[in-house]
Each structure stands twice: as C-alpha cells, then as structure tokens.
Amino acid sequence: MIIAIDYDNILNNLTEKTIEIYNKRNEKDIQMSDLTTYNFYNCLSKEIADEIMELFKDKKLWDSLAPIIGAKEGLQQLIDKGHRVYITTSTAPENFYWKIQFLNRYFSFFNTDNVIRIMDKSLLKCDILIEDNLEQLIKHKLCHRICLDYPWNRNIDDFIYDIHRCYNWNEILDEVNKIEEENEEWEKNNR
C-alpha cells in the first residue's frame, strides 16, 4: 500500500517542544490541552499565537526536536512490510531543510527522496493518510484516514468522516494491519 505520513507531531514532538520553549522564554504555563484547534489563532490570544509562530523560524527549535515514542520503529516496520511510505509536510519552504536534517539524524533508514512538501494533502494518491490535522483528513476522502490523537483534533465525531483515531504508534500499526487485511479480503472476494 501507499502510505502518506504527516511529519510534525506524527514523527516528532514539534508542538510539545514549541510550547515548552515558549513557556520557558515567557514564564507562561500554556498546556497542550489549551490547544483546542489546529490553528493557534483560534485558541490562543493573537499576541501569544504570533510569538509561537515566530518560534517556527528558529533553528534551535528544530534542533531540539525528538521522535515521538514508537515513530522510528513504526516507520521502519511499515517499510519492512513492503509499503511505499512517503512523509508529507505542509511546512514553510525555509523549514524543509531542517526537516530533512532531522530525518537524517533520527530516521537514517528513510529515503529522503520520499519527502513531499504539499499544502493540500487531498491531492495525494495514497491508500492511507496518517495525520494530526483534521482539515487535511476531512478533505482527503479517497483513502483510509488515521488521526493521531491530540487536543486540537478532538472537536469532531470521527465516525462521521470514517476517520480512525489512534493514540500511539502501536495503535497506528494495528490500524494499518487491519486495513491491509480488509483490502486483501476484498480483493480475494472480488476476483
């Protein structure tokens, strides 16, 4: 299967680290649970959202990121099973290089030629899209959609959009295996 995996918050701890750095620099106490929508401007004051958005231009932030638990092993397992895996990101062009550096540092087994910078992921032809941004998942109706749970994507009923919610990489792998088994069963019954 062709699997498109979002980069930020699926492979790395971008939002968690960004909030941590913001809180230290500003002596604030913003929590991940305060981020109730994907767009910071819809859940934080404009001043705070502006300051957080500025952090995305700071190389120190990108250098401080780490893989989330299970991401490295999960990505390796998907590749080992023979899936065609692409990492997708809707990043600013100036951050793309830093993202490639991160992959080379932590996911050296991954071919960085398979990283796609794309703002509208509904344009991707894939069997599965793994994301934390509900807007991207809702727009892409032609594939199986897996949402990694975060506070900013809890504001819909997943079943309405046939989105599979997972809480960690083990659950993501289980869901991919389930989808693969269902596809194999369908192909077997429709030959």
Protein language model regions, located:
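Conserved Lys-Pro-Asp/Glu-containing loop-to-beta segment of HAD-superfamily phosphomonoesterases
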Residues: 114-140
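Short, basic/glycine-rich phosphate-binding loops at helix/coil junctions
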Residues: 43-58, 82-85
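Substrate-recognition element of Asp-dependent hydrolases with the DxDx(T/V) motif
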Residues: 62-66, 71-103
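A structural signal for isolated positions on well-ordered beta-strands in alpha/beta enzyme cores
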Residues: 84-86, 128, 146
